[in-house]
């Protein structure tokens, strides 16, 4: 006699574990709390333009961000940076694409055209939000993340921690 819970038997768990496949899968949406760290490889940025403004400058660049933790992969980050020295702020907006895995999922690609990061130039406090909601490839998933700066690595690249929720439309596969 074979026993299973929600269609998952002990034998299927063992086979999936040997194959390195996540065991949990369902047809219902699955919410997953995620956390990890990242590094903005700012030292290797391609600066496309710099424009002086009365209060600072506006830069457009392309950068790569490395993510570790439950989101594991790279982000191609096309960013517009507005530096306002009167307000003492640096604000990043633009478009970014994440390519990688989420909690061991199959590879995904997700776009975010609504991210927002803000740095207080006086204190160095760095906070932001990420909205990886536009599916490009892989499992249907979307992630909403909060980001907090943690300083710089030995090369001077900004580092950060992220937390949030990823929702897989049809379970994690």
Please name every model-derived segment.
Residues 24-173:
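Beta-strand-enriched cores of mature, soluble protein domains
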């Amino acid at each position: 006699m074979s026993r299973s819970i929600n269609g998952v038997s002990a034998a299927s768990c063992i086979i999936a574990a040997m194959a390195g496949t996540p065991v949990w899968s369902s047809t219902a949406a699955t919410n997953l709390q995620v956390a990890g760290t990242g590094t903005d490889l700012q030292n290797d940025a391609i600066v496309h333009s710099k424009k002086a403004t009365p209060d600072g400058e506006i830069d457009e660049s392309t950068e790569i961000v490395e993510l570790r933790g439950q989101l594991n992969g790279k982000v191609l980050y096309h960013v517009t940076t507005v530096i306002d020295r009167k307000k003492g702020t640096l604000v990043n907006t633009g478009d970014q694409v994440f390519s990688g895995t989420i909690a061991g999922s199959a590879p995904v690609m997700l776009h975010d055209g609504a991210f927002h990061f803000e740095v207080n130039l006086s204190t160095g406090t760095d906070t932001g939000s990420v909205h990886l909601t536009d599916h490009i490839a892989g499992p249907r998933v979307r992630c909403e993340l909060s980001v907090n700066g943690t300083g710089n690595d030995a090369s001077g690249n900004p580092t950060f921690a992220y937390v949030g929720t990823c929702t897989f439309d049809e379970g994690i596969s």
